[in-house]
């Protein structure tokens, strides 16, 4: 029989013990399984929908490439704007943690923003939009997705309260896996349908997925919440909680890792205009990337679950580099010397890097789920993700600039190999921040430290 430690941060149920000690209430959404666990179902559906809306991702690329006739650097520039709402996730999280609607912090936000997201996809399908209007619609789609995923992340943390470290790890990885499964489910069809039906039909079909969240969240049982802290007090608590080397070092690492230029948009033009790949094949590629993402999550759960944060970040960075620059084999036609087809070497690094970044974030999510201060569930998760998304936004800007400087356009790809190698070197730049990553002793110290409110 395992005996509980007197130290509330080393006990089997660390968060529950801390809450009881401070006389706080248990989470607003009951995580105990009594019959059907609607909370967990809603969490999985949000993750699944977040992946399923990638059905429209290729259609969006072709919309800007063919309908609006943009060049690679212009596409990169336009696609910066949908990242903005994800940078604002901490603010969104503070709103959902602090401001209740009809006494609830989760259900109303999920219902309203999933419904609004569906309407925005319908506008892409039914309205003849200008370039500016289409960009605004993408911004609002991302804003809605940001609200929905922020609420789901808070539910993951709340449902982890009272669980062991291993159980908390499983809940976090299952939520991320649900997104990967959703993306994987529609990856191939995102290209296949482009050859069979118009973009408008694809946008219309995609609008159905957020509606599923709107309907399912009505079954979510949420206790009435009485606001005890204003948003400014919440912000102060959030800054105090994350202002430690355990978080700051990884934040800087992930930002630098994500913010360098990325060749993905230029490579998309190369595949479609130079190599003549059809939409169905581009969809097949996305299926491959979806499988890679899911395998990455499985690898973490099986092999890296007990690895240190520092080792996980270093290992994934080193593994990603050769995969990331592999398209040089294709752009330099090296594969032709060995009689290997172009299709086998079309590995666009952007999607693989996103998958690896998910793995890099997992240790931070799991740590957060086990030590998060009550009332900041959404805020802390959102802050971690906003760092990644700020890096992604910066990446789009640096990609657009470097694409322009290297004179890569719709049909000129003379400098694409040099561009890919430059992007790869920027990827390795994050390794210079390894000394800033926290040691296991620092992480254990944070687990054992009582958070003052």
UniProtKB/Swiss-Prot annotation:
Membrane topology: Multi-pass membrane protein
Pfam families: BT1
Function: Putative folate transporter. Required for sporogony of malaria parasites and host switching.
The family this protein is said to belong to: Belongs to the major facilitator superfamily. Folate-biopterin transporter (TC 2.A.71) family.
Residues annotated as signal peptide: none
Gene3D superfamilies, sorted: MFS general substrate transporter like domains
Localization (cell): Plastid, Apicoplast; Membrane
Entry's transmembrane regions: 41-64, 76-96, 108-126, 132-156, 176-195, 201-220, 241-260, 280-300, 312-330, 346-366, 416-437
Knocked-out gene: effects: Gene deletion does not affect asexual proliferation and sexual development of parasites in the mammalian bloodstream and parasite progression through liver stages. Following transmission to Anopheles stephensi mosquitoes, by day 17 after the blood meal, gene deletion results in oocyst swelling and formation of unusual intracellular pulps consisting of numerous single-membrane vesicles, which ultimately fuse to form large cavities. The apicoplast and mitochondrion are highly branched and spread throughout the oocyst cytoplasm and are excluded from the intraparasitic accumulations.
UniProt keyword terms in alphabetical order: Apicoplast, Membrane, Plastid, Transmembrane, Transmembrane helix, Transport
GO-annotated cellular components: apicoplast; membrane
Annotated disulfide bonds: none
Name of the protein in its database record: Putative folate transporter 2
Organism whose genome encodes this protein: Plasmodium berghei (strain Anka)
């Amino acid at each position: 029989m395992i005996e509980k430690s007197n130290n509330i941060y080393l006990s089997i149920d660390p968060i529950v013990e801390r809450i009881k000690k401070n006389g706080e209430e248990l989470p607003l959404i009951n995580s105990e399984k009594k019959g059907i666990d609607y909370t967990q179902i809603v969490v999985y559906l949000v993750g699944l929908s977040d992946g399923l809306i990638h059905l429209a991702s290729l259609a969006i690329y072709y919309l800007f490439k063919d309908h609006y006739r943009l060049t690679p650097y212009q596409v990169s520039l336009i696609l910066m704007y949908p990242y903005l709402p994800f940078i604002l996730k901490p603010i969104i999280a503070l709103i959902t943690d602090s401001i209740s609607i009809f006494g609830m912090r989760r259900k109303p936000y999920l219902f309203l923003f999933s419904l609004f997201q569906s309407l925005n996809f319908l506008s892409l399908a039914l309205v003849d939009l200008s370039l500016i209007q289409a960009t605004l619609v993408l911004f609002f789609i991302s804003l809605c997705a940001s609200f929905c995923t922020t609420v789901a992340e808070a539910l993951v943390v709340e449902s982890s309260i009272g669980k062991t470290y291993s159980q908390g790890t499983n809940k976090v990885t299952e939520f991320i896996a649900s997104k990967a499964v959703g993306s994987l489910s529609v990856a191939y069809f995102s290209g296949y349908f482009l050859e069979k039906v118009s973009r408008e039909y694809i946008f219309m079909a995609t609008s159905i997925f957020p509606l599923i969240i709107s309907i399912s969240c009505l079954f979510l049982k949420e206790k009435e919440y009485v606001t005890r802290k204003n948003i400014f007090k919440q912000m102060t608590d959030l800054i105090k909680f994350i202002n430690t080397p355990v978080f700051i070092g990884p934040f800087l690492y992930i930002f630098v890792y994500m913010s360098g230029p990325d060749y993905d948009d230029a490579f998309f033009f190369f595949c479609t205009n130079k190599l003549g790949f059809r939409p169905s094949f581009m969809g097949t590629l996305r299926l491959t990337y979806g499988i890679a993402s899911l395998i990455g999550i499985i690898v973490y759960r099986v092999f890296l679950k007990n690895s240190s944060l520092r080792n996980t970040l270093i290992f994934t960075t080193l593994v990603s580099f050769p995969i990331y620059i592999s398209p040089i084999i294709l752009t330099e036609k090296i594969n032709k010397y060995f009689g290997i087809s172009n299709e086998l070497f079309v590995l666009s690094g952007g999607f693989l890097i996103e998958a690896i970044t998910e793995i890099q974030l997992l240790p931070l999510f799991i740590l957060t789920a086990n030590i998060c201060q009550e009332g900041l569930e959404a805020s802390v998760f959102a802050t971690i993700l906003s760092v990644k998304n700020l890096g992604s936004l910066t990446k789009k800007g640096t990609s657009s600039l470097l694409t322009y400087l290297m004179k890569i356009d719709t049909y000129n790809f003379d400098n694409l190999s040099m561009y890919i190698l430059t992007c790869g070197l920027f990827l390795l730049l994050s390794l210079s921040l390894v000394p800033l990553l926290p040691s296991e002793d620092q992480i254990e110290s944070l687990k054992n430290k009582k958070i003052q409110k």
